[in-house]
Amino acid sequence: MSGPVPSRARVYTDVNTHRPRDYWDYESHVVEWGNQDDYQLVRKLGRGKYSEVFEAINITNNEKVVVKILKPVKKKKIKREIKILENLRGGPNIITLADIVKDPVSRTPALVFEHVNNTDFKQLYQTLTDYDIRFYMYEILKALDYCHSMGIMHRDVKPHNVMIDHEHRKLRLIDWGLAEFYHPGQEYNVRVASRYFKGPELLVDYQMYDYSLDMWSLGCMLASMIFRKEPFFHGHDNYDQLVRIAKVLGTEDLYDYIDKYNIELDPRFNDILGRHSRKRWERFVHSENQHLVSPEALDFLDKLLRYDHQTRLTAREAMDHPYFYPIVKDQSRMGGSNMPSGSSTPVSSASMMSGISTVPTPSALGSLAGSPVISATNTLGTPVAAAAGATQ
């Protein structure tokens, strides 16, 4: 049997082909290290698979920052994250990498980021209005269209990686640890993204995917927000994940997708997939979520959650969808800004990387900036005494 049919991104296909090699050749990247003594850790914010995250103070200017201390992984992966963050620095709603230092204790790299006053997404998502959802989805799309236009796929879009400072209506797309450069025809690792947000291409082991993977993940986020069902596709493992998707999108379109790309399905699916009809999106509407759902929301969702990655809306196409007309109208009226002028303060992250367990924040830590504890000598490797209650 011949292999799978190749696929190419519909947009930004050759971005990296036309860039100089040092733009995407992250393995050859030479990291410029900052001074770790500039930062004092205040409290632990959380931990994930690949890192531990702290709130810290930059003692040279007294500004709050977030420090992500990377766990020992391949140097290549660390360089990739750094190169991507440097390439994207200054882009709309992309978390700003402020510095790179070495943790003096572990000798592992630590990434220093702007600070985001984040609201826990599980609490926040339950309070958002229809307009809020449109607004924040549009802000995520700005970040995605930008990174895609720069030849980069995020590959881990999920609520944990979207920091929202709701008070200032500020959003940042964070955790670029799984992000990768797109090269047409390249086969990528399918062990990316988090289960509930994995696109069908990953679940059927199709490796020649592209930016459109991020659009599926965004669709999962949208569905969970408008239907108030978190997560929307709740699989117990990667195989069950595809079954959950098939129970909504139907098995007929799944088999069309498999046939189109000549994909060989894992035999484990034979006993679990069954036959399912395509469900109408309206069936997920009920009295508790109907105020968040509109015909244009369902049309938009339908154009994101497609098996065939080539038929999903691109980020730019998504921004032009009628669902966002009220947002576009307001932003053009306000000159493209999403808030009053003068509020360009940097955005605290409660979850600076994938799968992190959030740590409760003691209220006493609210205004540590001027406290004597901070001015005590506290280098990057040693959390301050006042923060002891915030560590796990």
UniProtKB/Swiss-Prot annotation:
Entry's localization field: Nucleus
InterPro entries cross-referenced by the UniProt entry: CK2_alpha, Kinase-like_dom_sf, Prot_kinase_dom, Protein_kinase_ATP_BS, Ser/Thr_kinase_AS
Catalytic activity: L-seryl-[protein] + ATP = O-phospho-L-seryl-[protein] + ADP + H(+); L-threonyl-[protein] + ATP = O-phospho-L-threonyl-[protein] + ADP + H(+)
Record GO terms (molecular function): ATP binding; protein serine kinase activity; protein serine/threonine kinase activity
Region (Disordered) location: 334-355
Domain Protein kinase: 39-324
Binding-site residues, ATP: 45-53, 68
A GO biological-process term: double-strand break repair
Domain of life: Eukaryota
Catalytic residues in the record: 156
Keywords: ATP-binding, Kinase, Nucleotide-binding, Nucleus, Serine/threonine-protein kinase, Transferase, Wnt signaling pathway
Residue ranges with Low complexity bias: 337-354
One cellular-component annotation, GO: nucleus
EC number annotated for this UniProt entry: 2.7.11.1
The protein's role, per its UniProt record: Catalytic subunit of a constitutively active serine/threonine-protein kinase complex that phosphorylates a large number of substrates containing acidic residues C-terminal to the phosphorylated serine or threonine. Regulates numerous cellular processes, such as cell cycle progression, apoptosis and transcription, as well as viral infection. May act as a regulatory node which integrates and coordinates numerous signals leading to an appropriate cellular response.
Assembly with partners or alone: Tetramer composed of an alpha chain, an alpha' and two beta chains.
Family: Belongs to the protein kinase superfamily. Ser/Thr protein kinase family. CK2 subfamily.
Protein name: Casein kinase II subunit alpha
Annotated organism of origin: Xenopus laevis (African clawed frog)
Gene coding for it: csnk2a1
